[in-house]
Design a protein with these regions (language model features):
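Membrane-embedded beta-barrel scaffold of Gram-negative outer-membrane proteins
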Residues: 51, 57-63, 219, 225-231, ...
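C-terminal beta-signal and adjacent terminal beta-strands/loops
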Residues: 234, 276-278, 320, 328-330, ...
Length: 472
């Protein structure tokens, strides 16, 4: 159900879902009964942890995941025949991880790494095409209209240390090297059907990243400490990013400064951050034909803000947990094409980046067996479009959930049973938490006119979940 709904439908019928909808010969609206997602994974893991003399420990793990499945979709052809298709994934993911650690009174050091390989087939097949609407249609049952593959090999190794200079000051360092190799083959029909962007037929790309981190911690006293850290992080594009364009790696310099207060019945942590990006991969608001969100590189951008996290015990029965974030998230000197003209939009807000987020949990325990929690979440307004187009603004929302847990036991069955009731959206707010923005160009009178549109994912109104957990 990744289609979403437009603004008019949001006002008139927010529960409408067009996935699988089609019309019979009399024009009646029907829904395809097998409009489904069917995906499975099998996980296998082997872990070996060993302790040695001198504070040494080692960890080694092997893993393998086999995933396969499809989504089946009824497609209304409008000017072409209706058809039903399946789009498949069949993939293997396996590798190993390791680490060796030594902890002493002066330092805590670790050397480790991992190797992982993902190998996947991606293909689509037709299950049915409305031959009556186009007698020249030659597709047959389960004929593949694209047949692609994608491989990703990743290796990383790191060394890190926490070193205690004295009882007040400690420093840490973390050096990581990552190597990523992509291989992908794209069939010609993938481009024809819109599965990937035109011009993309094969991917053979290698990335190598060196990511250093360092920081220091200073204990002012038993209750207060401060810290500073710097991290260099680099992230490769995904296969989907390549299928929708020619992206570059994202690079980030992250500076953070924090203070933590710990008292007998409360704790407060304040963290300031300044994140400087080069070629940040950001959401455009659009989705490709398979429903994946499309990302693009932008030039220079940043995120500057402050976070607060607190936990306060008000009494033996009442506890308050709060976290909030205030930030400025900006594109710098942002350019985009509109009406066929390259325009400078200046400094714009990064899409999908609200400037204020707050969460609050009030826990009340009348006795040792019952916990009642009121959870509140506020998210300020944000944009779907990097251009900050007015129609792409998503309004703020404020929602509350009520959670009830009763601990009990049943003799002869279990001594640890939790009866749970969760009331989501307690006050029945009609809100939207996510959506998208798109544009399309229409040539008119020797010029290009750009049209805009939005789609939304309205969230559920008040709903109740009841559960029972047993431990044997």
């Amino acid at each position: 159900a990744w289609y979403g709904i437009d603004s008019a439908t949001l006002e008139s019928n927010r529960k409408y879902n067009m996935a699988g909808e089609f019309y019979d010969e009399e024009g009646n609206s029907l829904y395809y009964k097998d409009q489904i997602d069917n995906y499975k994974q099998d996980h296998y893991q082997l872990h070996w942890n060993q302790n040695y003399l001198g504070g040494w420990t080692s960890n080694f793990g092997l893993h393998y995941t086999y995933g396969r499945g499809f989504y089946e979709n009824y497609n209304v052809g409008y000017d072409s025949p209706d058809y039903i298709d399946r789009r498949w994934l069949d993939n293997d993911f396996y590798g190993f991880i390791f680490s060796v650690n030594q902890r002493t009174t002066k330092y805590n050091s670790t050397i480790g790494g991992s190797y992982n390989k993902y190998s996947g087939e991606h293909y689509g097949e037709y299950l049915w095409i409305d031959q009556d609407s186009n007698s020249e249609n030659s597709y047959s049952f389960k004929e593949k209209f694209y047949d692609d593959y994608g491989n990703k090999n990743e290796f990383n190794i790191y060394a890190k240390i926490d070193y205690y200079l004295n009882d007040k000051l400690s420093i840490y360092g973390d050096l990581q090297y990552r190597n990523i190799k992509y291989e992908a083959g794209i069939s010609a029909n993938s481009v024809f059907t819109g599965y990937v962007e035109e011009g993309f037929s094969r991917l053979d790309k290698t990335f190598s990243f060196f990511n250093p981190k360092f920081g220091l911690f200073y204990n002012l006293n038993d209750s207060n400490n401060i810290y500073f850290s710097y991290a260099r992080a680099q992230r490769e594009p995904t296969r989907t990013d390549f299928a929708n364009g020619s992206p570059d790696a994202e690079k980030l310099n992250d500076f953070e400064l924090g203070w933590k207060l710990t008292l007998e019945n409360s704790s407060i942590n304040v963290n300031a951050f300044y994140m400087i990006y080069d070629n940040q991969l950001v959401l455009t608001g659009q989705r490709d034909i398979n429903g994946y969100e499309i990302r693009r590189n932008i030039g220079e951008s940043y995120r500057l803000g402050i976070e607060l996290d607190s936990n306060i015990t008000l009494s033996s029965k009442l506890n308050l947990n709060t976290n909030l974030s205030i930030s400025s998230n900006k594109n710098q000197d942002f350019y985009s094409i509109f009406d066929g003209i390259l325009k400078n939009y200046g400094n714009t807000d990064l899409a999908y980046s609200p400037s204020f987020i707050a969460n609050n949990i009030i826990d009340y325990s009348p006795n040792e067996k019952v916990i009642i929690s009121l959870r509140s979440n506020y998210v300020s307004e944000q944009y779907f479009a990097q251009t900050n187009s007015p129609i792409s603004k998503l309004e703020s929302f404020f929602v509350h959930d009520l959670n009830f847990i009763h601990k009990m036991s049943i003799k002869g069955l279990s001594d640890d049973i939790n009866f749970k009731v969760l009331v989501n959206n307690l006050f029945n707010s009609k809100y939207v938490s996510y959506g998208g923005y798109y544009t399309y160009d229409v040539p008119t009178d020797n010029q290009i006119k750009t049209y805009e549109g939005t789609y939304y994912y309205p969230q559920a109104e008040i709903n109740i979940l009841v559960g029972l957990d047993f431990k044997f």
